[in-house]
Amino acid sequence: QNEEQAYPQPKLLKANLRPYQHKGFEWMILLSKIQAGACLADDMGLGKTLQTISFLCHLFEADDAAKFLIVCPSSLIYNWKQELDKFAPHLSVYIHHGTGRNFEHFMQSDLQVCISGYATLRNDIEQFELPYWDAVVLDESHYIKNLHAKTTKAVYQLNSKSKIALSGTPILNNTFDLYSQMNFLLPDLLGGQEFFR
């Protein structure tokens, strides 16, 4: 730990964070400590996934019984698994997708990370809403830009200590796209829909 680093890189992380990635990692920790969610909206290729994995490693080093949920488009599920295996091999991963899903097994096991797709989360929300997650990560968080969509309503039912939204394009059409994502991270901070408009 030096003067420019509020938090050292996790010992369990199998990578060296670039200075800007370290700042993002520290930012997630600081927001988590004040119970505020974080939206990381870097361009593609700047390491949003690595910064997030660093944050999960930090939480795991503080509590090895922690449980994390990563929700992403189904096409990215195995990419997340590969990145976790590469950079955080100590974190055990359960993929909740397709046939043969067994969420109860995950909850009763020593596995730390559950990865699921948005559609599966929506269909199985009765299971996902029960735990109090140590962290919930939404990758491609613009998937919840529609405040009234079933997927968004399901995501809002999740309970967690820390919330992270990742997106290279948090605003696709207009600034209201951001409202639902920020309302997940910081409920009620932006006021009602009409006030925000």
Could you tell me what each predicted segment is?
Residues 2-197:
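ASCE P-loop NTPase motor core, strongest for the SF2 helicase catalytic module
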